[in-house]
């Protein structure tokens, strides 16, 4: 698996925004990725970032209905990335240059 295929997208929720102050970032990652691979992918994708800890959460599929047809959403995996104290911050929102 390529390192740039591991991280899918950042998770933007109220609780994940509250964790930014503590140096924790939440990403949706590939379900086959393990913690060491996630750490390597974050350090490769963002310059000057050093990862201290990786916590992972497997999110099970939810049942959904469209009319009389039932189905399930896809299972996903979330990773909570904790950065070291001397690490640069990850820029999730690029500021517009005026």
UniProtKB/Swiss-Prot annotation:
One of its GO terms (biological process) is translation. InterPro entries: Nucleotide-bd_a/b_plait_sf (IPR012677), Ribosomal_uL23-like (IPR013025), Ribosomal_uL23/eL15/eS24_sf (IPR012678), Ribosomal_uL23_CS (IPR001014). Gene3D superfamilies: 3.30.70.330. GO terms for molecular function: rRNA binding; structural constituent of ribosome. Transmembrane segments: none annotated. PROSITE patterns: RIBOSOMAL_L23. One of its GO terms (cellular component) is ribonucleoprotein complex. Belongs to the universal ribosomal protein uL23 family. Coiled coil: none annotated. The keyword Ribonucleoprotein applies. This is Large ribosomal subunit protein uL23. One of the early assembly proteins it binds 23S rRNA. One of the proteins that surrounds the polypeptide exit tunnel on the outside of the ribosome. Forms the main docking site for trigger factor binding to the ribosome. Keywords: Ribonucleoprotein, Ribosomal protein, RNA-binding, rRNA-binding.
